Amino acid sequence: MGLSNKFKSFFFLDEEEEYYEEEVAREPEPMQKKTKKEKPSKNRFYAVEEEDAKVVSMQGAQYSSRMVLAEPRVYAEAQELADYLKDYKTVVVNLQRISHDQATRIVDFLSGTVYALGGDIQRVGNNIFLCTPDNVEVNGSISEMLDEQNFM
């Protein structure tokens, strides 16, 4: 028994030395209310997102009032046009004074940009394109009207 008491005292605390840790009662944290927000997509379907209820400033809605008219001469100017789109500015691109290969590359680059930003690109004339960010909605089509009036 003496040996077992030595093991107990070595590995375990003696009854006199036992330490009890009292748990401090925490105050419950207030829960944030989750709200479901309907977000319209391009196909007029509604995607439901769950997000925290927060107050957001409406400064983003003011960016849609800017429009940039551009007539690039080289492919390197496509990045500047993409930066305008990232800043929520509508861009009208006239590609009539650039080679066909360069124009194709610019349209491909801008198509990828507007896709990534959730925007849209439309042909509005012969080598003229309208690129819009996601906060701009375009109704109608000029190309169809031009075809009807034989302008092309």
UniProtKB/Swiss-Prot annotation:
Annotated protein name in UniProt: Cell division protein SepF
This protein's record includes keyword rRNA processing: no
Family: Belongs to the SepF family.
Location, primary (coarse class): cytoplasm
Organism the protein comes from: Listeria welshimeri serovar 6b (strain ATCC 35897 / DSM 20650 / CCUG 15529 / CIP 8149 / NCTC 11857 / SLCC 5334 / V8)
GO cellular component: cytoplasm
Encoding gene (name): sepF
InterPro entries assigned to the protein according to its UniProt record, in alphabetical order: Cell_div_SepF, Cell_div_SepF/SepF-rel, SepF-like_sf
Compartment annotation: Cytoplasm
Transmembrane segments: none
Gene Ontology annotations of biological process type: division septum assembly; FtsZ-dependent cytokinesis
Chain intervals for the UniProt region annotation (Disordered): 23-42
Keywords (A to Z) from UniProt: Cell cycle, Cell division, Cytoplasm, Septation
Subunit structure, as described in the record: Homodimer. Interacts with FtsZ.
Pfam families referenced in this protein's UniProt entry, alphabetically: SepF
